[in-house]
UniProtKB/Swiss-Prot annotation:
Name by which UniProt lists this protein: 1-deoxy-D-xylulose-5-phosphate synthase
Record flagged with keyword Cytoplasm: no
Source organism phylogeny: Bacteria, Bacillati, Actinomycetota, Actinomycetes, Micrococcales
Cofactor detail note: Binds 1 Mg(2+) ion per subunit.
Keywords annotated in UniProt: Isoprene biosynthesis, Magnesium, Metal-binding, Thiamine biosynthesis, Thiamine pyrophosphate, Transferase
One term under GO cellular component: cytosol
The keyword Ligase is assigned to this record: no
Annotated Mg(2+) binding sites: D145, N175
Cofactor(s) listed in the protein's UniProt record: Mg(2+); thiamine diphosphate
Catalytic activity: D-glyceraldehyde 3-phosphate + pyruvate + H(+) = 1-deoxy-D-xylulose 5-phosphate + CO2
Cross-referenced Gene3D superfamilies: 3.40.50.920, 3.40.50.970
UniProt cross-references to PANTHER family, sorted A to Z: 1-D-DEOXYXYLULOSE 5-PHOSPHATE SYNTHASE-RELATED, 1-DEOXY-D-XYLULOSE-5-PHOSPHATE SYNTHASE, CHLOROPLASTIC
Length: 657
């Protein structure tokens, strides 16, 4: 039995010797490599925080002391130390979440995996502790240097630093990266701290001497206090000359570090000093992403930030290569567009490769801007670029557009800026769970005046609609696509005058008009499956892909007026979604055809594969067909209306599907 097998809670760490702790760190790394290579997950970040997490749990008393992980993908070690060692179904339906989860443990606090929010959580928790008479309880926020490129982190620091008595410990996990190397002025500032003062200021002798002289002089009456203030000012001046690290202390926060993030003794000493300091403290820990695993360290792109199933010995992906991904199709096309148009620029929020701007950047490095984890800034900066005669393409995961809605509405749309926003990982994404599903975007952008929204169904339509988007220079455009592999090409029977594609009429050649199916983006394959099933039950269908779902095309409304029932199949939330908008346009035009929105419920959906999540919420061909048959037979609302010369059925039985 290894040492890891004996750990059930953080208190089990307290009696371990230095040698045992080193052995435990080795066992944890071996465990992570073995298990995450079988399930996929965030391997590199967790290999980099093994000693740091051990030290945090040995010095602080969780859950009495609150530990908050920014983004949370580096919480695997924390899970192991808090009694969760069944990683066999990590990120799978019914298994452990890839992020902190309150449902799993009292040691978990923040479940959202959106970056830069941990310090605001720490600020709020510490205020609550202070106001409820529990100000002696610590709040520890573990935040990466990448997350400190986000403005929200600095809003929190501004508030934390204002109160010198709250026990907030900010542990900066500085590995010089988020996905890729961290960029920007603050990244340069942190880099300036690394080689100069090293671990000198975190050494025990330094702190002991400092505390001894401080007490001696402050207890020496007015002369001693004057001498202390003079020497303290001199010390600060020398520090600022020796290394430009005065920013945190200028804000009124004690700074400890840099500390070797893989040296347990140094980490524990630094954290104990922070714990015993009755005020806000920054502990600056230098770590290495992928530490202890050669394949991760050698991986230039992101040091195994997130992996699929891999060979644990080599780090190479197992199995055969899959079909081309949506992201790779976008990457090729935007690079081609950039070759043709010098006014097109790319903007990424610290995710150059994941969002597919790397090929563009390789060809035109001066025209791709990495703004850090700063989506709000990205959108407003894009508006400024548009004003200056450029056409910015902001590529971001769909879930992260949530963070920049005000900027989209008030800076981009209000000023009719020609900005294209490309949303990767739209819809249900699967194993990363509630905070990563890109299911909110279509409802959000419905209320943005003048915005154009495209949802391509296949690779050809993605290329086509991306080019159409960057041709619009007087309004914002959004192009959204799913995670993973692109499906087969779906050719249209015809394209209507306003750009709507008719994909199928079932039965073929039918002139009957029972059900109009409006498919949004990648749901077209599902829509065609439903049409075939309905056709087998004698119900005629017309399947259309609007391509551009906003503004609603007139032909959609016209087709709706000639059908008994409209269903809109989308992989966003039903509330305020595409179907809802189509209904509004139908009613405004006096079309009273019943419409059924088939989409996602307004719920936070747990992790699982995409197909598992869709089945869980009823977005399957079988369930949709069952519901539509019931609506056509008049046994379920909304009832399909009778067309002229038809009578509404009053009875009927559902077939077995």
């Amino acid at each position: 039995m290894g040492i890891l097998d004996t750990i059930r809670n953080p208190q089990d760490l307290n009696d371990l010797s230095e040698e045992q702790l080193e052995q435990l760190a080795s066992e944890i790394r071996e465990f992570l490599i073995t298990n995450v290579s079988q399930t996929g997950g965030h391997l590199g970040p967790n290999l980099g925080v093994v000693e740091l997490t051990l030290a945090v749990h040995r010095i602080f008393d969780s859950p009495r002391d609150s530990i908050v992980f920014d983004t949370g993908h580096q919480s695997y070690v924390h899970k192991l130390l808090t009694g969760r060692q069944d990683f066999s179904t990590l990120r799978q339906q019914g298994g452990l979440s890839g992020y902190p989860s309150r449902a799993e443990s009292e040691h978990d606090i923040v479940e959202s995996s959106h970056a830069s929010s941990s310090l605001s959580w720490a600020d709020g928790i510490s205020r609550a502790r202070q106001l409820t008479g529990e100000g002696d309880r610590h709040v520890v926020a573990v935040v990466g240097d990448g997350a400190l490129t986000g403005g929200m982190a600095w809003e929190a620091i501004n508030n934390i630093a204002a109160d010198k008595k709250r026990r907030v410990v900010i542990v900066v996990n500085d590995n010089g990266r988020s996905y890729a190397p961290t960029v920007g002025g603050f990244a340069d500032y942190l880099a300036s701290l690394r080689p100069t003062i090293d671990s000198f200021r975190a050494a025990p002798a330094y702190e002991v001497a400092l505390d001894w002289w401080k007490k001696k002089l402050q207890n020496g009456g007015p002369a001693g206090q004057f001498t202390y203030k003079s020497l303290h000012a001199m010390k600060k001046g020398v520090k600022d000359w020796w290394a430009p690290q005065g920013m945190f202390e200028d804000l009124g926060m004690k700074y400890i570090g840099p500390v070797d993030g893989h040296n347990l003794q140094a980490l524990e000493h630094a954290l104990a000093t922070a714990r015993n300091y009755h005020g806000p403290v920054i502990v600056h820990a230098m770590t290495e992403k992928g530490h202890g695993y050669a394949p991760a360290r050698a991986h230039e792109a992101d040091q195994f930030h997130a992996v699929g199933i891999i060979d644990p010995e080599t780090g190479e992906p197992t199995g055969t290569a899959g079909a081309k991904s949506w992201t790779s199709v976008f990457a090729d096309e935007i690079a081609a567009i950039a070759d043709e148009r010098k006014d097109v620029v790319g903007i990424t929020g610290a995710m150059l490769i994941p969002v597919g701007l790397h090929k563009f950047a390789a060809k035109h490095p001066d025209r791709v801007i990495d703004v850090g984890i700063a989506e709000q800034h990205a959108l407003t900066s894009a508006a400024g670029m548009a004003f200056g005669g450029l056409h910015p393409v902001v590529a971001v995961y769909a879930t992260f557009l949530n963070r920049a809605f005000d900027q989209l509405l008030m800076d981009v749309a209000l000023h009719k800026a020609g900005v294209t926003i490309v949303l990767d990982r739209a819809g249900v994404t699967g194993p990363d769970g509630a905070s990563h599903h890109g299911m909110w975007d279509m409802s959000m952008v419905q209320i943005v005046p003048g915005l154009h929204l495209a949802a391509p169904r296949d690779a050809s339509r993605l290329r086509e609609e991306l080019r159409e988007a960057v041709a619009i220079n007087d309004a914002p455009t959004v192009v959204r696509f799913s995670k993973g592999s692109v499906g087969a090409e779906i050719e249209a029977l015809e394209r209507l005058s306003d750009g709507v594609d008719v994909l199928a009429r079932r039965p073929a050649g039918s002139t009957a008009n029972d059900v109009l199916i409006v498919s949004v983006g990648a749901m077209s394959e599902l829509a065609l499956d439903v049409a075939n099933r309905l056709g087998a039950q004698g119900i005629s269908t017309t399947v259309v892909d609007p391509r551009w779902v906003l503004p609603v095309r007139r032909s959609i409304v016209a087709l709706a007026s000639h059908h008994r029932l409209v269903i809109c199949i989308e992989d966003g939330v039903r509330a305020g979604g595409v179907g809802s908008r189509i209904r509004q346009e139908m009613r405004a035009a006096g079309v009273d055809t019943a419409l059924n929105e088939v989409g996602l419920p307004v719920e936070f959906l747990d992790h699982g594969t995409r197909s598992e999540v869709l089945e869980r919420v009823g977005l399957t061909a079988q369930q949709i067909t069952h519901d539509v048959v019931a609506q056509v037979l008049g046994t379920k609302v909304p009832f399909a209306r009778p067309l002229p010369g038809q009578q509404h059925p009053t009875t009927g039985s559902l077939p077995i599907l």
